[in-house]
Regions:
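His/Asp/Glu-enriched, well-ordered alpha-helical/loop segment
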Residues: 10, 208, 229-240, 276-280, ...
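Active-site gating loops and adjacent loop-to-helix segments of metal-dependent hydrolytic enzymes
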Residues: 65-98, 174-177, 223-241, 266-269, ...
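Active-site mouth loops of central-metabolism enzymes
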Residues: 85-100, 150-161, 182-189
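N-terminal metal-binding scaffold of metallo-dependent hydrolase/deaminase domains
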Residues: 1-37
């Protein structure tokens, strides 16, 4: 049996430094003092904060390290040009090439303490190349990192030919979550139809939901309202996530705070991508210029589950990113003004 003891660990909820005993890679005991055999390996943490592994709940592993790809440059720095550039350059991607880039990104995240990743896989591709690559990666790395995969229609569920069918096929192949992008659909009716379809598929296949929702400065982009209502009706709010919801930062306060009640009732989860959205949003603004984030502080203060994520690592949407969630957190709590006394 392999034993290892860590001493002088600073743990949340403990006033004193603690010792941690690990046996065969499993945490066995936490106490102020643990007696072990003389040959047990001991590592002194020197009073450093010791935390569980991080979760990156929103990233696109099929996109990573493509920012310098021929034709992928996003000159306007907007969400919509990013999608256009991706659409124009993704046709020559292969399973092996996607996996090689994704493994590099996963290693970066793991080196920064991440052990759980939810990645979106673009299924607006008749060959489903990205999904196949990430399903293989998930299995190959299962002993290192836990990966969830979202069947995600980057170019729209109804604005891309057979997008809804491709999302469903992705679920049949093994994707864990149903994705959508209602604000990118050609019209509001298509966006609403896509939300209904997302919920229908989630119920049919007993899958989680994670929708790119209202990633826009447009205060009339309010698809999260429909997603919330349907999650309440179906009783699946805790299994449902709304990612981005940037437009909540642009709507008037009376609407936002009315919605807080429904968000709370539904149990809906929210993901904000602070480094990504402060970069992408507000591009049509002069001044004042919006920060582009959802109402992180208000969601948190209302007891609604909200978290931060990396989203991109050097792709057509965001030229930076290194998988360090502490950098994302640092930016998030500053941009969302969550450090006020």
């Amino acid at each position: 049996m392999a034993r290892r003891k860590f001493i002088n660990a600073k743990l949340k909820g403990y006033n004193e430094l603690q010792e941690i005993l690990v046996e065969d890679g499993v945490f066995k005991k936490i106490a102020p003092s643990i007696e072990v055999a003389a040959d047990c390996e001991v590592e002194d943490l020197g009073g450093k904060l010791t935390l569980p592994p991080y979760v990156d709940p929103h990233i696109h592993l099929d996109y990573v390290f493509t920012a310098r790809k021929q034709g992928a440059t996003n000159g306007t720095g907007t969400l919509f040009e990013g999608i256009q550039r991706w659409s124009e350059t993704k046709s020559d991607l292969t399973i092996d090439e996607i996996k090689a880039r994704a493994i590099k990104a996963v290693k970066m995240e793991v080196s920064h303490g991440v052990q759980y990743i939810r990645t979106h896989a673009d299924v607006t591709d008749p060959n489903l190349t990205a999904l196949k690559a990430l399903l293989e990666l998930k299995e190959e790395l299962k002993d290192i990192v836990t990966i969830q995969i979202v069947s995600f229609p980057q170019e729209g569920m109804y604005s891309y030919k057979d997008g809804d069918k491709l999302v469903e096929e992705g679920l049949k192949m093994g994707a864990d979550c149903v994705g959508g992008i209602p604000h990118f659909e050609y019209c509001r009716e298509f966006g609403e139809k896509s939300i209904h379809k997302v919920v229908e598929l989630a119920v049919k296949y007993d899958k989680l939901i994670d929708v790119h929702c209202d990633e826009s400065d447009d205060p009339m982009s309010r698809f999260v309202e429909l997603l919330t209502a349907l999650s309440i009706v179906e009783g699946i709010g805790p299994k449902t996530t709304a990612s981005h919801t940037c437009s909540l930062g642009s709507v008037d306060n009376s609407y936002a705070f009315r919605m807080m009640k429904n968000f709370k009732k539904s149990g809906l989860n929210f993901i904000s991508c602070p480094t990504e959205n402060i970069y992408l949003q507000g591009r049509q603004d002069t001044y004042p210029k919006r920060r582009g984030l959802t109402r992180v502080k208000e969601l948190y203060e209302n007891g609604i589950n909200v978290c931060f994520a990396q989203d991109s690592i050097q792709d057509p949407w965001y030229p930076a990113g290194n998988g360090n969630l502490m950098n994302v957190l640092d930016n998030g709590i500053h941009i969302a003004q969550m450090m006020s006394f």
